[in-house]
Amino acid sequence: MRHPDVVIIMTDEERNAPPYEGDDLKAWREEALPARHWFQQNGVSFERHYTGSLACVPSRPTLFTGHFPDLHGVTQTDGLGKDASDSRMRWLRPGEVPTIGHWFKAAGYDTHYDGKWHITHADLINPDSGLPIPTNTENGEVIEENVKAYLEANPLEEFGFSGWVGPEPHGAGLANSGFIRDNLIAERIVKWLKDRYLRRESGDAEALRPFLLVASFVNPHDIVLFPGWRRQENNPIKKSDLDPPKVPEPPTRHEDLSSKPAAQIAYKNAYFSGYGPHNRVKKIYERNEQAYRDLYYRLHLEVDGPIDSVRKTVSGNTLNETILFRTSDHGDLLGAHGGLHQKWFTLYDEATRVPFQIVRTGRNPSQPRTILDIPTSHVDLIPTALGMAGLEEKELSLKLSDSFTEVHPLPGCDLSPLIENQNKTHFLERSVYMMTRDNMLEGDNLASALARHLGRANNPPAPMKIRVPADVASNFEGIVKRVSDTDAQGGKGNLWKLVRAFDDPSTWSHPGVRQLTSSSPPAIRHRNSTIPDQWELYNLDSDPIELENESKNPALGEVFNFLKNCLKEESANQVPERNNPWPYARRKPPKEQIPVKKPPPPARFLRNFLQKIGLHPEDLHPFEDELNDFRALIVCTNHSWLDVAKPTGVFSSEMTVPYYLFTDAGIEVDLASPLGGEIAIDPMSLRAVTRSHHDDRFLVDDLLKEKVRKSISMSDIDVEIYDVIYFAGGWGASFD
């Protein structure tokens, strides 16, 4: 049996048309976007398709591994709040969860990927500059030598693909914008396809193998560049006869969000700080809303040509059967729901509902149909692609389990029966699960894009510091499901969405200990208490714009409780436990941002003198590695008075130096004492002249102060659980 070729065409940030899109925009889509129109006219369109996760980085491995973030591990997006090396970033790890590339490679396919990847940090780095190696200029001129370097390095090989040419089209530079890169991506792919088809015609055995091709385009993602592109002189996109009509504001633009989870209003009040001075950036958006919405739709036009050139090359080849998928990684809120932007801290349809279309070409072409009533998910891609290609999931799973540690049954559905217009009863009853833990603005340095651009990342001035969404939970999960009156009174056979906003200490900035809960002036704040769950409930048939949160409507109590149980079941069924846990790393602020109590200038001078003669010498070889899976115990004294009636205790630096050396390396540290409770600290050791810089940290560190007040009794300690036990000195220790 000859297996068909499989082609996946992706865009970035393209939402499905919302229900409030008017007739003029629908007409514009048909006229100006021929690539999308071709898929509509030749394939099966799933109008209720959901991403599975948000945002960019978590969504892509959800699509390409067929699993949710709690299994594949990728939960955070770099960009505004984090750079690629941020301690809180979690890129897909090799050798754990196989990608669709691995699945098809195991079946004998060639697997080729070109365009935006954004699942691992795959850029080649120039060792001299420390910057990604470019493959094109801002004018779109190709740097052939660097393209060759990427092809030779083959950075995606361990993730199941070849052919990728970086760097990621990500960031503010024009050279990495979709405006420049999408055409270059399309040109490379068309060249690759034409060569492949030509070699097949000549009987080349290697070329005759079926292939999986991913063509991953950027736009309409350039909408994130709007603050810089709002002025016409800075915008590379020129007016066109095919410009979209004026895009009206969404009907939820002015809702006050008072009935929604608190994270949404907190995110609204924090988002702009990711770019730069909050109030200034906010004004740019609010004064240019029409231009903002119009640009988003115009960017659909920019990428339609590159999509169509790939599509025409594939559909023009009549010798082979090909299955084409078209989708996007996520959508965009575009000012809906009270003025929310992008796709974080919500599961609204504008952010989670995206195009999903399947076309089969060849001897048995697909018949055009639109499926309106069945919810589908990104996790359905791999089962559907395998099913339509005639490949056995169980057989391939056994083969992959020899090479990967996290091979689990795929949670998605094979949608191929729907392509064949077979019985859809089973699909009508399904629940579609989705989740996100993407706390995008929370990173190590809390530096806005402008601060980083100006070289102020480690110590940004207050106006250029990111404000994290304050005092809210940052995890969301939800389901979309049809509920009958038999299931729950009030369901009415309608399609419902239930969303839970929840806190999870395992994901805190200091996991299990405390969470960064505010970074607004005058000081950073943490919390160590868990925020209660908050809920959203929407009837998607009667309220498709998700305006009325029905979670507290007593008339819908049965529907709410029924869906709560369904959500709990789906979460357990759809997200299996990892074989090898991957705990979250602790946030690591730069040294410049670590709070300290500075001594006054005279004391500072005397401290420097004492350091030169040997007190608290500087560590000339600081430890730089990570020891995240280790635990340490520091044992101190309870004895606070000498027999001669002088106060005593542990000399502070004997405790603070090992404590901060351990914690800065990622080690979890407990404090213990013979009796438990208050640890005695020699007051002389905390005087401005005699204390160390570690003591300066202690004096403003509420967490360590709490540990000092509530040390663990040695009688309650199991020493076997610790990798290091350190006995802190001090006169009082001799009395214990």
Which positions does each model-derived feature cover?
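Catalytic-site neighborhoods of secreted/periplasmic enzymes
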Residues: T65-E187, K191-L208, L225-G228, L428
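Active-site-proximal N-terminal segment of extracellular/periplasmic enzymes that hydrolyze or transfer
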Residues: M1-E47, D533, I545, E550-L556
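C-terminal, low-complexity/hydrophilic appendages and adjacent surface loops
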Residues: D349, T436-S551
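Short, structured active-site-proximal loop/turn typified by the sulfatase FGly-forming signature C/S-X-P-X-R
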Residues: Y20-R60, G66-L71, D110-T111, F560, ...
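Substrate-binding rim/cap in mid-to-C-terminal beta-strand-loop elements of soluble/periplasmic
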Residues: F64, S162-A175, D308, K343-T425, ...
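Core domains of carbohydrate- and sulfate-ester-processing enzymes
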Residues: E47, S59-R60, A107, H121-G171, ...
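Active-site-proximal cap/lid insertion segments
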Residues: E13-R29, G203-R209, F217-P375, M388-L391, ...
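Extended, subdomain-level signal for the structured scaffold at the beginning of enzyme domains
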Residues: K591-F735
